[in-house]
Amino acid sequence: VPAMIERNWGRVVNISSAWGSFAEGLEGVPSYAITKAALNALTIHLAREAGPDVLINAMCPGWVQTRMGFDSAPWEPGGGLPELTPQEGADTALYLATLPDGGATGGFFRERAPLDW
């Protein structure tokens, strides 16, 4: 990030999770929610520190439709969140990485749309 600030240009896409916005409700996996909430806070802090020329955002998918996610889940996949395909996740990351100058910074996105938290 310091080199991006020095050049007055850059893009950072943090991969977080919709679970990082919840204060409770993840019985059995609070450490996951806590680490994602910390990443969300870091996204906001870095965006403020970097200024308007370095865009720092986070994509926050819910469940991604992969075998690994469903086999390892300690709770019911989905949990009320819409599922996302791997392609939709990749499209969101590409969208954020290629935002035009003056685009959103310090935001959280799912399927190219900002999340209201």
List each model region and its residues:
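C-terminal helical subdomain
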Residues: 51-54, 58-59, 74-117
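Short, flexible micro-motifs
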Residues: 11-13, 23, 65, 92, ...
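Residue-level detector of flexible, active-site-proximal loop/helix-junction positions
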Residues: 19, 63, 113-115
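Short beta-loop-alpha junction of Rossmann-like oxidoreductase domains
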Residues: 23-24, 60-73
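Catalytic loop of short-chain dehydrogenase/reductase
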Residues: 1, 5-52, 70
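Glycine-rich, flexible loop/turn motifs
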Residues: 28, 64, 105
